[in-house]
Structures are given as C-alpha cells and as structure tokens.
Amino acid sequence: QEVFMWIEGNYRRNLMDMHIDDWNPEFLSRINIDEYVDALKDAGIQAAMVKGRPHTGLAYYPTKTGRMHAGLKGFDFFGTMIQKCHENGIAVIAYFTQIFDNWAYETHPEWRLVTGDGKGMREYRGMSNFKTGRYGIVCPNNAGYRQYVKDCLTEMNTLYDFEGMFLDMTFFPEVCYCPSCRRKYMDDTGRELPRKIDWKDDEWLAYVYKRDQWIAEYAAFATDCVKAVKPHVTIEHQFSRITGSWIDGSTEDIMKAVDYAGGDYYGGFLQQTFINKYYKNVSPNLPFVYHTSRCDPELVYHTTTKTEEELLLHVIT
C-alpha cells in the first residue's frame, strides 16, 4: 500500500494542456517555468500533471526516441518542471500520449490507423470524431508502434522520478482496417475481419468484442512497460471514453491496468455528478480523478473561461 501513499488526500490537481507543434520557432521558446510553478503554488496545487510527450509526439525533454520539440532549443522542460514541483512539495503526474501521435503518424506511415475508406486520419478535413486533420492516429496493434511506446515509457521512467503517469487516449477513435488489425484478427479467430456493421450478425458482434479486448490488452501492455522500470509509479489510463460509443473499444477491463480511474469530461457539473458516482464504484483505489477545463464549454473554445460560479460548482460536486 505504500505506493499509493501520495494519492491519499491529494485532491487539488492541475494540467496545463500543451499539445503545441513546432512549425513556428517561437512556440514554447519563451516558456517560464518559475512563473508556471508560482501559479501552481498560488492555487494550492497538490499534484501537477506535466506534459512529457503530447499529441504532436514531440518530446518536451531531450529524447533518444522520436524527436524533441524544436522550440525548446534543447531545454529540458519536463525534467525541470519535475524538479521545481518537487522542490515546492508538489507531486508530479507525467503525461504521455498514446495512439494520437503526429510524429509517429508522419514518420512511420506503416503504423497508421486505416479507416474503412482506406485513409489515414489526417487525410480528412472538417469532419467529426477526430476527422479534422489535426490528429495523426496510429494503431495500438502495430508491433512497431508498440516498441516505440515501450521505448518512450522506459526512457521517461529511467531518466526521471515522478509519482504517477497519465497514459492518455486509450481507445480506438475509428474502426481500423490496417494490416496489423487484419492479421491479428485472423490470428485470434481464423477469420477475415468483418467490414459490414450488422448488429444481428454474430460475427460482427464477435469482432466488436474483440476490439474491446484489444484495447484492454494494450492498456495492460503500456502499464507493464512503466511498472517494469518503476513499480511504484501509479498509472491512470484515459477512461472517459467508457461513456462513448462502441467504436472506442473502452470497457471496464481497462480498470485492471490502472491504480485509479480518471478521465476528462466537458459536459458540465450535472454530468460530473454521475461520473463521480460511477468512478467511485469502479476505481481500484481512491481518490479517482475527474478532469475538466476552465474553457466554456470545452477545450475547443480555448479563449473562453467559465464563470467563477461554474468553477465553484465543479469544485463542490
């Protein structure tokens, strides 16, 4: 039980979302860690989630796996934040993106999630369900991508000491028909991967269930990568998609790969009242984590801020 000591009574947490590319050399070039940590202290933050590798796939620390964000000019943002937070009594949760990784998508086309149209996700524009062109999405069933994940997580846990990790985006944003998925389905079932959605077809239902198993198995794989290096580091996988559609492949089996439940939601405090009750019942340990933003109503509207009353409702719910 000692490994969970840091989460006991730790309720006031913060994440500064920083999925920032480096096509403009000014991006992140003037980031001020002292101001950042001072703001955390001023807010009484007990644990800071610090970006290590965001959706861009560009590391915020000097890395031998993939590529570092060019705007940092070699500055170890991740490591320095960990040090400064610990000096000020703030626990650190390291952030690592999964499946949503633009660097991996662009550098390794063979890792890409392939839609029913035969396209990668960045080939779409202006559509819903992550088909906006912003996110490069790769397949968790691809062996090359899994090795990359293992290398990244091993590197982060070898170079740095932190209390926990948030492994984000543990779900399928689309049905994938890549060679890895087709081969894996054949190996698992001896059948071709079905391509027609038919809820009266037993083969289709078996495939949907198999996708659920794949996501849970991937979550266990990623958790094992961390625990192999730092057994005491707590793990939180993105679990918000449990309330999404069948496409996501998110089930309560993911709870077998975490130390506590957590996920981000943007449906207001009424949604929060339900999720809080649900998470309390499925989380292996307490407290669970309910993430939400100051943006109104969600992250897309990043220039807006909820009223003080709305934020208070989130705090007391």
Residue ranges and their predicted role:
Residues 39, 43, 84, 137-172, ...:
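An active-site-proximal structural segment forming one wall of the substrate-binding cleft
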Residues 2-3, 10-13, 44-52, 76-130, ...:
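Glycine-rich, aromatic-flanked loop segments that form ligand/cofactor-binding clefts
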Residues 15-31, 59-76, 131-151, 200-218, ...:
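The substrate-binding groove and active-site-proximal loops of carbohydrate-active enzymes
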Residues 31-56, 159-160, 310-317:
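Catalytic domains of carbohydrate-active enzymes, especially glycoside hydrolases
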Residues 51-54, 216-217, 229-232, 236-317:
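Hydrophobic targeting/anchoring helices
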Residues 94, 98-160, 190-208, 220:
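Active-site-adjacent "subsite" loops/lids of carbohydrate-active enzymes
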Residues 41-76, 100-118, 122-123, 174-186, ...:
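Aromatic-lined carbohydrate-binding/catalytic grooves of carbohydrate-active enzymes
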Residues 91-103, 166-170, 205-248, 265, ...:
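Aromatic-lined carbohydrate-recognition surfaces of secreted/lumenal glycan-active proteins
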